[in-house]
Amino acid sequence: MSSNLSNSQILNNLLEGRNLDELTSRSLMQRWLNDEISDVETGAFLSALRAKSSTGVELSSMAEELLNVCKLPVARPNLYLVDTCGTGGDGANTFNISTAVAFVAASCGVKIAKHGNKSASGKVGSADVLLNLGLDLNCSLEKVITAVSEIGITFLFAPVWHKSLIKLAPLRKTLGIRTVFNQLGPLVNPLRPNAQVLGVASEDLLEPMGRALLKMGMNRAIVVYGSGGLDEASLQGENKLVLVENGELRFSKINISNFNHENIANEKLVVSDQESNEEILKSVLNGSGQISHINVVALNSALVLWAAGIEDDLNEGFNKALFSINQGDPWKKFLLLKNYLQTN
């Protein structure tokens, strides 16, 4: 079913600050997928949605339409899957924390299906760093899916699964602003995870993203806005959280000082180039990294362990993540995934 509103009527509603209902939101995404919206109209729609701010209904409805056209080559594993994909776009140029978190959580027993892409605004996105470390993201889609059952973690490179959106990439790059598609990225993991920790680059996205996850049936999730504007939980100070659990949203806060560790400025997490990002990621995973790098990964990993239902006590989750890192288990998990994806 499609909305009877024309493109210009939908655009006018957005420009007047009116929220779109579920039917109209789905119809808008269908029109993008069916090439029924021109480049000029697309630019106007994306700018209008950005100016208005997207709602949970708009985000969940558009995400569902994208997922409906994303077909899996083999059956989804019957596992409790967790994603650590966030919006990106905080512009802070930190090392790739969420990617490190994925391997730490996997080494603690979480089944990770990480959705990701190349960099939006940072030095390197999750796909960039994994490719540079030798992970084969061009292997068969079947192998990508079976990896989560065999190894306990997999990585889904967004452009491979959402080919219909590739045509919008040049226009989005030309616009040069964060758009609704940055917000949709974490919501359209083809394996439809049961739980998620989702970092946002803007505080006003906390509730809409939480409501979108709730509407999409997420069992447990945490949306996090980090102190100092990070799209991860930060060591700098108080981090704001929206927790999705038992069909409800609740708001919370977390600070590394709660774990008897000192606050550290976000500048300590910044990387200058691609090579240093890879070095830091590897050093965290093998347990040889700086304490600030290890602590920020352990803090975010504790959130993932909560979402996975493995550790309800965040202090216990933090300590569990630290222990795994100190043992070098996350790096072993990375090597297992690398070898698995390379074999025929």
From Swiss-Prot:
InterPro entries: Anthranilate_Pribosyl_Tfrase, Glycosyl_Trfase_fam3, Glycosyl_Trfase_fam3_N_dom, Glycosyl_Trfase_fam3_N_dom_sf, Nuc_phospho_transferase. 5-phospho-alpha-D-ribose 1-diphosphate binds at residues 86, 89-90, 94, 96-99, 114-122, 126. It holds the Pfam family Glycos_transf_3. The keyword Isomerase does not apply. Anthranilate 1 binds at residues 86, 117. One of its GO terms (cellular component) is cytosol. GO terms for molecular function: anthranilate phosphoribosyltransferase activity; magnesium ion binding. One of its GO terms (biological process) is L-tryptophan biosynthetic process. The keyword Transferase applies. Its EC number is 2.4.2.18. It catalyses: N-(5-phospho-beta-D-ribosyl)anthranilate + diphosphate = 5-phospho-alpha-D-ribose 1-diphosphate + anthranilate. Pathway: Amino-acid biosynthesis; L-tryptophan biosynthesis; L-tryptophan from chorismate: step 2/5. Its cofactor is Mg(2+). Binds 2 magnesium ions per monomer. It comes from the Bacteria. Coiled coil: none annotated. Mg(2+) 2 binds at residues 231-232. Mg(2+) 1 binds at residues 98, 232. Anthranilate 2 binds at residue 172. Catalyzes the transfer of the phosphoribosyl group of 5-phosphorylribose-1-pyrophosphate (PRPP) to anthranilate to yield N-(5'-phosphoribosyl)-anthranilate (PRA). Belongs to the anthranilate phosphoribosyltransferase family. This is Anthranilate phosphoribosyltransferase.
